[in-house]
Amino acid sequence: MSQFLRRITSLPIQSIRSFHSFDEVTPAKYISTRLKNGVGSRYVCQLQRLTIQVCKEFRTSFGTRDWIANDLIKFAREHPYVVVYVQPRRHRAPNLVGEYLAGDRQWIPLSNCDREKVNWWIHSLLTQKGDPQWRLLKQMHTDSPSVQGIWTPFTNKPIDRITRTYPDKDLTEMEYPQITATQQIQELFEQQKLNKTS
Amino acid sequence: MAFNKAQQLATFSRVWYLFDAKWQCPHMSGERIARILRGEHKPIYYPGESTGDCVIAINTRHVALRNDAWRSEALHIKREYAKTRYDIPLFKLHELDPTKVLHLCVLSCMPSDSIRRYDMARLYTFPDDAVPVHLIKNVCDQIRGSRVIPKRLDDLTPNDTKTFPQMFKWPKELVLDDLDRDKFVRVVPPEEIPKREVMLGQRAGKQNYWFHVPTSRHEEVKIN
Amino acid sequence: MVRLLRYGTIFGPLKDRWRYLYKRDLYKRRLEAGPEPERFRSALINWNYDAELYACTHRFGEKLNIESLRNAMTDASFLKQIVKQRTEAGLAATDQTTLAFTHNQELAKQGKQIAEDFLQKALHYWYPKFPQEGIEAITKFLLSESTIADISSGLGFKTLIRCDIPSPRPTMLTNALFAFIGSINENTGRSRAEVFVADFILTHLVGKDINEIWQVKNPMGLLTKVLEENGRQAPESRLIWATGVSSVLSTYVVGVYSNKEFLGKSAGATVSIAEEMAARDALRRLFETDEKRAQIPFDKLYKKGLLLDK
């Protein structure tokens, strides 16, 4: 009940994303495009048809009416791949319904939107893939993470480690230890010896 | 099994390491071991993921603490009720459980989150170099120590001492007998040692151990 | 949409007894009525089939005749249904042949042939060392009904197909896509149809491992055979790494060598699995299809000489 109230009160009226509660487990997936759109030599607009439901009299659809009067023809010319239906309905709120190639549907209420806002929403639907209901696991994803070969714990590990029996005495001590005073003296002594003989 | 599954297995496989703690400082080796147990040495490390490796530490009985730490440092135990906290000095702790010191050093090097216990479960400690066969079979790499293992005087052969270069000659006036320490020092009998009062379970601090630690058994003797 | 919320729960108790009973009765009746039957998209008021077809030609940038596209989108079941309706209405058998359109079976056959030829050609070009058997397996996967139906529904043919059921079956979707390719071939030429296949069917390989698509039962046997054909010695496998042998998460890394020459290596939970995977890795390296290999340049197939004219 409280969730329901929160949804009504806190969310803006126009929002394309549905309410998401972190208490619930919702379906999620990696980011992707439908049918690898744009990988080939052409891009296919995913919006298939657009239905604008509008009232001719009410004030709530003034912006929608404006858009239809001024921008609709231009829009249809620029985007011949979208079928636009205008549906006049008496004394009801204006709506925007987009249907996508994959069969998804988007519904956006346009009440009291001015012409610019209507244009914004229509272009928002135009550039979408169509399914905002999915939660994205990550903002980026790749199917081939590496072309050099994926790292394993064994890459760059000296190969002789497998042939030894553990505990191994060679691997116990430091790899590059500091020379002790005793060793320094011994080295100096040997150098002296060499100098004397030569 | 698909091929990408095999790659996944190879990347996330847990490698078993061996660590020989003989003559090593447990604090410094604890840092290394903790890093490996948490998987921080891997490029795939990510805080939420469990990418750590397994470590078998042997010879923990023979760890070498710095300075006077065996005597001066202690495990502070604070129990729930008032006036029940006490200290165990590390040499006593080492007698009770020879693996505990290294274990605690590794534990203190890990951030205190909930994953720490699971990471610590991948550490196997053994007081000597006797390790069960089924564990030593797993090992495929060894962690190097952080200290040079010193050579003790009684390890040296008489040949070593002979061939070592003579740095200087003793002056003739010097009586070499005077170097004998026992001449200047008297072993103090126990009844002469001043007794300290020990408060049980009162305060943390090396004066307040739960048993008596006599320290000064020797006394300087002045020879006129 | 029918509201299936139980009245009198989330909006507090209903005070009027009669209203409660009335709502409860409506609720029960709705449940008894069952789910709504599926409807054709064309049954809705905002539907103009000609406009949809026109948009469809522009969507893919193809210059198609609308009538030819209409034929391509007509399934055999639709024609059968119309004939049946006419017979029931009492029309003569001779009138049934004067329908203005045909179904898409012929076009689909043609389109499928084009797709198959092109895919084989492209795969042969890009993976020259991959055996013929494997290329056939990949082509079969790409042209299988599930794949093509998925592509077809993703391209929006689901609502455009004319058939006797509201949600078309996979075979209908498949036929529609192939018929679309066929009609491109008829209208604007074969090269254009091949570009369509490259753009929408061949790209289905993105993110997929073609070695997994072709399932080799006995990789070591195949490796031996391939090496024999190349005049090299039989493969030998050697254990490279082993860790956690007695634990649950044991890992073995096995390498495959031929005459002390490295072929491939892989990890596995047991030695036998690791050996099998190593043989697979060796095959991938021999066929040059491993991850080092670049993807097919889907947008530059012209430059590679696969498609001559644009």
Place the predicted regions along the sequence by residue.
Chain C
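Double-stranded RNA-binding/processing signature
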Residues: M1-K310
